[in-house]
Amino acid sequence: MYRKMEVSLSKDLRKKYGIRSFPVIMGDVVKVISGSRKGEGGKVAEVDHASGLVVVEGITIARADGKQKGFGIQPEKLQITHLDLSRGDRFDKIKSLAARKNIVVEKPEPEPEPRKEETAEAQEAKEEAVAEEKTEVDDNDKQN
């Protein structure tokens, strides 16, 4: 069964876009506003339209065998704090809904992902620092 699962928006998003709720997808950042997990939040990991539940990263429940499993939360108990507008159709929908209330929405700047070269350089620098610390510890041990 397919069902659009709309989640209410936070107050600042309501003011920014002029809408009260919007369908939730993977990548949105949400927080729990009621229930036993109230106050917790994170990025949406899975949206299960068949059962009508949303799984959020970092919110888990222990299974009988001791492993952790994603905890399904009903969408009416969630609130979107950050929308993932990387998909163009989603941004167009927000833009058209905001236009009804005479609100102009600008396309957000995409967050740049770190390049592999930069992360490799940072990793090498970290390894060098660890190697220097080890040699200092070895030198101190030899002197004592």
Swiss-Prot record:
Which SUPFAM superfamilies does the record match to this protein? Translation proteins SH3-like domain (SSF50104)
- GO CC terms of this entry: large ribosomal subunit
In terms of InterPro entries, this protein maps to: KOW, Rib_uL2_dom2, Ribosomal_uL24_CS, Ribosomal_uL24_euk/arc, Ribosomal_uL24_KOW, Translation_prot_SH3-like_sf
Basic and acidic residues: bias regions: 103-134
The Gene Ontology biological process annotation of the record reads: translation
Q: Which UniProt keywords apply?
A: Ribonucleoprotein, Ribosomal protein, RNA-binding, rRNA-binding
Q: What's the domain of life for this entry?
A: Archaea
Show the GO MF annotations. Answer: rRNA binding; structural constituent of ribosome
Q: What does this protein do?
A: One of two assembly initiator proteins, it binds directly to the 5'-end of the 23S rRNA, where it nucleates assembly of the 50S subunit. Located at the polypeptide exit tunnel on the outside of the subunit.
Which family does the UniProt entry place this protein in?
A: Belongs to the universal ribosomal protein uL24 family.
The entry describes its oligomerization and partners as: Part of the 50S ribosomal subunit.
Record's protein name? Large ribosomal subunit protein uL24
